[in-house]
Structures are given as C-alpha cells and as structure tokens.
Amino acid sequence: MTVAIGRSDSERGWFDVLDDWLKRDRFVFLGWSGLLLLPCAYLAVGAWFTGTTFVTSWYTHGLASSYLEGCNFLTAAVSTPANSMGHSILFVWGPEAQGDFTRWCQIGGLWTFTALHGALGLIGFTLRQFEIARLIGLRPYNAIAFSGPIAVFVSVFLLYPLGQAGWFFAPSFGVAAIFRFLLFFQGFHNWTLNPFHMMGVAGVLGAALLCAIHGATVENTLFEDGDGSNTFPAFNPTQAEETYSMVTANRFWSQIFGVAFSNKRWLHFFMLFVPVTGLWMSAIGVVGLGVNLRAYDFVSQEIRAAEDPEFETFYTKNLLLNEGIRAWMAVQDQPHENFVFSEEVLPRGNAL
C-alpha cells in the first residue's frame, strides 16, 4: 500500500502555487529572496548611475559631482544629504521635497534612496544564498561569509551617521568621495590607531595572503594526469580522485614553517574565519566611532610632548597631522558653518 503525504491539488492555495513558481528551476534562480534582491539592487544601481550622471552636489556640499558638470568616474559621486536634513529619510513626498523631484535630488534624496535600497539588496543577496543552499542541501556558510561585507556597509553608511548629527557625515557614493571620508575618519577619530581597525586590516590582508598561499600551493601540487602542455584540461568536475596532493602540500609547508594544516576542513574553515572576523571587527569599530568612542589615546606622551619641544613620537606627530585635517577639512567640508580659524590655532610642530 502506498501512503501519499501532503496536500492534494484541490487543497493548494495561491501561496503554494507562487512558492512553486518562484522556486522553479530556471537559468537565473528567482526565489522568495529575489523579490527583495532584484528590485532593490536595480533601484540602488539605477539611482547611483542617475546621480553620478546628472545630479549636482552644489546644494549639499558646494561641489560638482556629476558627469554633466565635468567630473569623471573617479570624481563623480552621489553625495550625502545636506547637514540641515539631519536623519530624515527624505521621501519624495515628504515635507522636505513636497513632491518636487528636482528639489528632492538637490537636497540629497538620491543618497538615502541608494543607501537604503543598497542595504536591502545586500541582505536579499545573503538570503538568496541561504535559500538556494537550503533547497540543494548545502550548509549556509556562503551566506555567513557574506555577512561580513553587509556588516561593513550597514555600519559605515547607516549606523555611523545615525550616531552623528545626520546623514551628511556618511560617505558619499563615489571613489574620491570615499577617499575624503577616509581622511575624515583619520582626522576626527584617529581611526588607524583603533584596535578594531587593526583587526580589520589583519583580517583582510591576512585573507589575501591565505588566498595567495592556498592557490599557489594547490597549483604547485596538481597531479600531472594529462597529455597537454598544462594540467588544466585534465580536470573533470565529476572525477572521484583528488586533483592535487594534500600530502605533498603538507610536507612542503611543514618544512617551511615547521607546522602545516593536515586537515582540509580546518584549513578552509580558517580561510573563512580570518576575513569574516576581520570585517566584523571593523564594523564594530565603526559603530563605536558613531558614538564617538575613543581608543588608544596615549595622554602621557601628549603631555610630555607639550612640555618638552625635543620630545616627539610617531604618535604625537600623527596627532598634529590629525589636527591639521580637522582644521582644514572642516572649512572645506562644511562651508555652511562659515568656520574661520585664525593662524594661531592651526597645528604647528615638527610633523608639519
């Protein structure tokens, strides 16, 4: 006797029909996650192209920022809203723009549109990895790994400005604009000396080193199992045997370092752990800066350097440079504040 478990076609509702259609096997998988990913990614990318092509930053930053004004790919940007907008979501129909699309673009509405849809698109991409992994019986480590970039994006573009006075202090979406934000972070937060930044650098550069070492080691130990000039055509995706010698790789690195991974599972988990942990540490550090937490202020060196003109360290020299960044950037970056600094307050010292 055969027992059928499930519901008959007559009991299937619209949700079941939609679920089947979304999860149908097609060239590009759609899925429930696609309902979030595809429209949000399309709108975020479209808004960025629109802003960098046509929209000025004159009303928000006093800058030219579009191809229409003469910028190139490196200098164009979708700039953050005006400082006076605070943390407003800036809906087109909101009290700021009042349904005027041109005014909405002028006050920085495209930035909030791009940032929020971009964040939702990234989250949708992670959910897509979860969904496909679940359907084909994989573990969800790809989605877990992608949580690192999401954490960095959300912390830098959303959480940091939420802790500050407004969206104005977030990075604008552009290459040179990101560079300016890095200088801002250093000058106002001494970011390079922050331990969370150090862990982030160690994670990202360490991951690059691990990736290079791993790729080179596998290439070095490929089995010569083909007749061609190289071993690439000899590989078959369905072959049962190994394509490189783990034993040889282990012996090589044991001679180099004295220790080596003998377990492929630990090796690849370590390659996952290093960059993802580094990105998460960076994200945590940025959230801390959002609420103006300080890290590594060596006050004793500052006091001694102030009292003894012959005593200076790389730390005190960097502090002078940070003071210069703050003094000169504030005038340029916030022209609406009409800052005026007299010559006496500008930083002086051997560092300059």
From Swiss-Prot:
Cofactor annotation comment: The D1/D2 heterodimer binds P680, chlorophylls that are the primary electron donor of PSII, and subsequent electron acceptors. It shares a non-heme iron and each subunit binds pheophytin, quinone, additional chlorophylls, carotenoids and lipids. There is also a Cl(-1) ion associated with D1 and D2, which is required for oxygen evolution. The PSII complex binds additional chlorophylls, carotenoids and specific lipids.
InterPro entries with a match to the protein in the record: D1/D2, Photo_II_D1/D2_sf, Photo_RC_L/M, Photo_RC_L/M_CS, PSII_PsbD/D2
Keyword vocabulary terms for this entry: Chlorophyll, Chromophore, Cyanelle, Electron transport, Iron, Magnesium, Membrane, Metal-binding, Oxidoreductase, Photosynthesis, Photosystem II, Plastid, Thylakoid, Transmembrane, Transmembrane helix, Transport
Entry's transmembrane regions: 40-60, 124-140, 152-165, 207-227, 278-294
Pfam families: Photo_RC
UniProt KW Membrane keyword: yes
Positions with a binding annotation for a plastoquinone: H214, F261
Binding site for chlorophyll a PD2: H197
Catalytic activity: 2 a plastoquinone + 4 hnu + 2 H2O = 2 a plastoquinol + O2
One Gene Ontology MF term: oxidoreductase activity
Entry-linked PROSITE patterns: REACTION_CENTER (PS00244)
Residues bound to chlorophyll a ChlzD2: H117
Cellular component, GO, one term: photosystem II
Gene Ontology process terms (BP): photosynthetic electron transport in photosystem II
Subcellular location as annotated: Plastid, Cyanelle thylakoid membrane
Binding positions (Fe cation): H214, H268
Annotated EC: 1.10.3.9
Protein residues bound to pheophytin a: Q129, N142
Function field: Photosystem II (PSII) is a light-driven water:plastoquinone oxidoreductase that uses light energy to abstract electrons from H(2)O, generating O(2) and a proton gradient subsequently used for ATP formation. It consists of a core antenna complex that captures photons, and an electron transfer chain that converts photonic excitation into a charge separation. The D1/D2 (PsbA/PsbD) reaction center heterodimer binds P680, the primary electron donor of PSII as well as several subsequent electron acceptors. D2 is needed for assembly of a stable PSII complex.
Family: Belongs to the reaction center PufL/M/PsbA/D family.
Quaternary structure and partners: PSII is composed of 1 copy each of membrane proteins PsbA, PsbB, PsbC, PsbD, PsbE, PsbF, PsbH, PsbI, PsbJ, PsbK, PsbL, PsbM, PsbT, PsbX, PsbY, PsbZ, Psb30/Ycf12, at least 3 peripheral proteins of the oxygen-evolving complex and a large number of cofactors. It forms dimeric complexes.
Note: 2 of the reaction center chlorophylls (ChlD1 and ChlD2) are entirely coordinated by water.
Protein name (record): Photosystem II D2 protein
Gene it is expressed from: psbD
